[in-house]
Amino acid sequence: MRTLFIGDLHLSADRLDITQAFTRFLDTELDDADALYILGDLFEVWVGDDIALPFALELAEKLKQVSQKLPVYFIHGNRDFMLGKQYARAAGMQILPEVTCLNLYGIETVILHGDSLCTLDKAYQRFRKLRSLSLARWLYGCLSKKTRQGIADKIRSNSKSSNQQKSYTIMDVEPNAVDALFAKTHTKHMIHGHTHRPAIHQLANGCQRIVVGDWYEQGSVLSVSAEGINLQSLPFEQTT
């Protein structure tokens, strides 16, 4: 048996090919899985459970079917932080805290989306702090659907423009932030996404940091079992 980790699918109505590949993955790759963890940014943008698009509602039905066979866990990302209990319930997903520790076959591991580790991106971290406030989230939820969609589109556009101007270092995790989280959680193994730079990092202090990749051009899946770990790319044509 094995536990699977994915993230950064960025599903949208503009890229239904990714949704189709993910659906095939759910149909074909979970037979021997103990659990599925989705580490954020399942969707490209999420402005509220009351504005879920048809493709997202269909996906919820598929995930609900999966959840009847194995647990499906979800951690919010920077794109879908407004995904709420209503959609999670419809999809059979259990929402986890943004930093969660779990025992993976005897190994204490911390999992998260990963955006909180990119501390050199000061502008984004200010936005992240603001959006985490309960009052800010409540006020946003009170806006009309049209206004929320407009704000989300603006943030998405600004994010793409801003990211093109940021350096590689700023867009990646900051080593001190990684070390601090290891110390805080008393773990030596970490799994996250967000940076879209899949890799297994063996750190000098004996810790291990694994990054799952995005699903823009191919799938990225981390499989963890008692025998070890396997971070693999999954070409979309292999899911047919």
Curated annotation (Swiss-Prot):
HAMAP family to which the protein is assigned, alphabetical: LpxH
Taxonomic lineage from the root: Bacteria, Pseudomonadati, Pseudomonadota, Gammaproteobacteria, Alteromonadales
Gene name of the record: lpxH
Cofactor-binding details, from the entry: Binds 2 Mn(2+) ions per subunit in a binuclear metal center.
Cellular component GO terms held in the UniProt record: cytoplasm; extrinsic component of plasma membrane
Classification via CDD domains: MPP_YbbF-LpxH (cd07398)
Binding residue positions for Mn(2+) 1: 8, 10, 41, 196
Species assigned in the record: Shewanella baltica (strain OS155 / ATCC BAA-1091)
Record's protein name: UDP-2,3-diacylglucosamine hydrolase
Cofactor(s) required for function per UniProt: Mn(2+)
Keywords of the record: Cell inner membrane, Cell membrane, Hydrolase, Lipid A biosynthesis, Lipid biosynthesis, Lipid metabolism, Manganese, Membrane, Metal-binding
Residues bound to Mn(2+) 2: 41, 78, 113, 194
Compartment annotation: Cell inner membrane
Known function: Hydrolyzes the pyrophosphate bond of UDP-2,3-diacylglucosamine to yield 2,3-diacylglucosamine 1-phosphate (lipid X) and UMP by catalyzing the attack of water at the alpha-P atom. Involved in the biosynthesis of lipid A, a phosphorylated glycolipid that anchors the lipopolysaccharide to the outer membrane of the cell.
